C-alpha cells in the first residue's frame, strides 16, 4: 500500500505496519481506544506496559505530554540529535489515556525523522503508536514482505524501506537519563 492508503487505514482506526529507523512498526491512532486495543490484541501485549508514540515534531505529542514538567535542559535533550534512535520516557498529562501509558504516569515518545513516519503523521494529523512488527517469539520485521509473512498478505503495510539503524531504539528516562533499553 502507498502512504495515502495507509493514512486512510489509520484514520479508520486500523492497525498498520510502517517502516521506522531500524524495523517495521505496528501503529494506529493513539487517540482511538478501539484501535489501540486491536494493536495490543495483535501483539498479545499487556496494556500495563504502555506504548511508544513516534512523530516528526513535538507538536504531535502535545495532547499526551505534560510539557510544563519538562525544564529547558530536558527539552534540549529531548530534541537532540543522536547516533541511534532514542525513545524518551516523559511526564504524561493526567488526561492521557491509560491504554497508552499503561501502569505509569509517564509516556514514551520518540522524535522520528524517517520519511514514512513524517509523511503519515502529516497526512493524518496525529502521532503514531509504535511497537515492533512481529508476533510473539518472532524477530522484528525489516521488510514489507516479512510483515506479510507474519501477519498475512492482506495486512495493511506501507511498501517502503526501513532506515539504516541496526537496532531498535534506545529507551531513556528524560528526567534522570536512566537507560532502560540499549539501542
UniProtKB/Swiss-Prot annotation:
Entry's Gene Ontology cellular component terms: cytoplasm
EC number, as in UniProt: 2.7.7.87
Recorded GO MF terms: ATP binding; double-stranded RNA binding; L-threonylcarbamoyladenylate synthase; nucleotidyltransferase activity; tRNA binding
Cell compartment(s), UniProt: Cytoplasm
UniProt catalytic activity: L-threonine + hydrogencarbonate + ATP = L-threonylcarbamoyladenylate + diphosphate + H2O
Domain YrdC-like: 1-183
Predominant subcellular localization, coarse grouping: cytoplasm
Group of enzyme by EC: transferase
InterPro entries tied to this protein: DHBP_synth_RibB-like_a/b_dom, Sua5-like_dom, TC-AMP_synthase, TC-AMP_synthase_SUA5
GO biological process, one term: regulation of translational fidelity
Keywords associated with the record: ATP-binding, Cytoplasm, Nucleotide-binding, Nucleotidyltransferase, Transferase, tRNA processing
First and last residue of the signal peptide: none
Family: Belongs to the SUA5 family. TsaC subfamily.
Function: Required for the formation of a threonylcarbamoyl group on adenosine at position 37 (t(6)A37) in tRNAs that read codons beginning with adenine. Catalyzes the conversion of L-threonine, HCO(3)(-)/CO(2) and ATP to give threonylcarbamoyl-AMP (TC-AMP) as the acyladenylate intermediate, with the release of diphosphate.
UniProt-recorded name of the protein: Threonylcarbamoyl-AMP synthase
Organism in which the protein naturally occurs: Haemophilus influenzae (strain ATCC 51907 / DSM 11121 / KW20 / Rd)
Amino acid at each position: 500500500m502507498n502512504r495515502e492508503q495507509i493514512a486512510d487505514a489509520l484514520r479508520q482506526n486500523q492497525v498498520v505496519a510502517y517502516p521506522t529507523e531500524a524495523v517495521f512498526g505496528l501503529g494506529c491512532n493513539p487517540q482511538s481506544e478501539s484501535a489501540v486495543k486491536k494493536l495490543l490484541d495483535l501483539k498479545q501485549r499487556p496494556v500495563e506496559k504502555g506504548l511508544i508514540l513516534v512523530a516528526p515534531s513535538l507538536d504531535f505529542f502535545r495532547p499526551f505530554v505534560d510539557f510544563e514538567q519538562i525544564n529547558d535542559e530536558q527539552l534540549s535533550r529531548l530534541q537532540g540529535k543522536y547516533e541511534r534512535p532514542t525513545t524518551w520516557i516523559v511526564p504524561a498529562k493526567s488526561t492521557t489515556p491509560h491504554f497508552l501509558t499503561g501502569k505509569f504516569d509517564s509516556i514514551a515518545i520518540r522524535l522520528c525523522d524517517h520519511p514514512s513516519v513524517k509523511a503519515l503523521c502529516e497526512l493524518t494529523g496525529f502521532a503514531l503508536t509504535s511497537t515492533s512488527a512481529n508476533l510473539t517469539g518472532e524477530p522484528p520485521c525489516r521488510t514489507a514482505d516479512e510483515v506479510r509473512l507474519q501477519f498475512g498478505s492482506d495486512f495493511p503495510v506501507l511498501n517502503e524501506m526501513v532506515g539504516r539503524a541496526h537496532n531498535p531504539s534506545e529507551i531513556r528516562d528524560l528526567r534522570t537519563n536512566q537507560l532502560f533499553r540499549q539501542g
